[in-house]
Amino acid sequence: MCDAFVGTWKLVSSENFDDYMKEVGVGFATRKVAGMAKPNMIISVNGDLVTIRSESTFKNTEISFKLGVEFDEITADDRKVKSIITLDGGALVQVQKWDGKSTTIKRKRDGDKLVVECVMKGVTSTRVYERA
């Protein structure tokens, strides 16, 4: 089910990430540092538990979850959110909710790449990863 995502991925391109972070409410200084980071994403599966770890010079974060089960998450910019991740059409779709707001993060395979689309209101950021 999630096996296509398993592995270590390195960021190779990022479009519109600053505008997305601004829409989410991330402060200027944090946006500048986070925007320069080139994170590796490590995805693993153990039974029905999926773990996504992001490692960069900016910050390391890790979430472990079961598909379709809501969990508490502290994001890289320190937002406390409720997240739920589902598998939809071969994509891992994450919805984060906090303070009456929500954002969607869709992770999908495209050939040998992992494409992450982050959407907040009308702002979309696309980040592309390749296997490390």
UniProtKB/Swiss-Prot annotation:
Annotated consequence of substituting R31A: Abolishes ligand-induced translocation to the nucleus
Gene Ontology CC: cytoplasm; nucleoplasm; nucleus
Renumbered ranges of motif Nuclear localization signal: 22-32
Record-level GO BP terms: brown fat cell differentiation; cellular response to lithium ion; cellular response to tumor necrosis factor; cholesterol homeostasis; long-chain fatty acid transport; negative regulation of DNA-templated transcription; positive regulation of cold-induced thermogenesis; positive regulation of inflammatory response
Major subcellular site: cytoplasm
Pfam families membership: Lipocalin
Keywords, sorted A to Z: Acetylation, Cytoplasm, Lipid-binding, Nucleus, Phosphoprotein, Transport
InterPro entries the UniProt entry points to: Calycin, Fatty_acid-bd, ILBP, Lipocln_cytosolic_FA-bd_dom
Modified residues (N-acetylcysteine): C2
Phosphotyrosine modification, residue list: Y20
Modified residue annotations for Phosphoserine: S13
Gene Ontology MF term list: hormone receptor binding; long-chain fatty acid binding; long-chain fatty acid transmembrane transporter activity
Domain of life (superkingdom): Eukaryota
UniProt: a fatty acid binding residues: R127, V128, Y129
UniProt xrefs under Gene3D superfamilies: 2.40.128.20
Location in the cell: Cytoplasm; Nucleus
Effect of K32A: Abolishes ligand-induced translocation to the nucleus
Subunit details: Monomer. Homodimer. Interacts with PPARG.
Free-text function comment from the UniProt entry: Lipid transport protein in adipocytes. Binds both long chain fatty acids and retinoic acid. Delivers long-chain fatty acids and retinoic acid to their cognate receptors in the nucleus.
Comment field on protein domains: Forms a beta-barrel structure that accommodates the hydrophobic ligand in its interior.
Family note: Belongs to the calycin superfamily. Fatty-acid binding protein (FABP) family.
Name by which UniProt lists this protein: Fatty acid-binding protein, adipocyte
Record organism: Mus musculus
